[in-house]
Amino acid sequence: MKKLIVATLLLGSGTLLSAQKTAKIPAYYKPAKSEMYHKDWIDFNKNGIKDIYEDPAATLDARIENLLQQMTLEEKTCQMVTLYGYKRVLKDALPTPEWKQMLWKDGIGAIDEHLNGFQQWGLPPSDNENVWPASRHAWALNEIQRFFVEDTRLGIPVDFTNEGIRGVESYKATNFPTQLGLGHTWNRELIRQVGLITGREARMLGYTNVYAPILDVGRDQRWGLSLI
């Protein structure tokens, strides 16, 4: 967990999808707390001092220990939580003033499948304006990231996760066969290309962590996902 937290902290700081329609992206606003941003470091905890965990020149282990020493139990707990995104659990597409009173006021480990265009099972696709085009989607995720960096105490960036077992789990992304179908091709190069496309589309949409297919044989009949 220790290395995952700081890896997220570090990472936080050819188009393959169908043709995008031209859409006006909201004006990129100046950071609300511009004094945080320095030439070679970011004052994540807003104390005006370059703490060890904020120093890119410090060793990874030193940064991890320094950050953990500053974290409360609530902040550590929240870094172990994944929050399902818009229309699943999260009700808001973008940050609102109420977020400063919600569970994730202390940060959150990950937000999964946020603004991917899907709602609860059986419901039609979301018509939220931030789902598409991809440039608008990436902008929206950046605005959410800004909340976690600028408006939480330690400024730990959130990880934007998504499924990648048969393409990115996004309404506009390329859909591939399930793991079982891909496995039946016995074509390693084809599977490599599927992974390449999935990665490029996820990156374009702004997702930072994509779950890969299980590279193993499912032998336990109690595990229903082995048939997916």
Language model region names:
Residues M1-K21:
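Bacterial Sec-dependent N-terminal signal peptides
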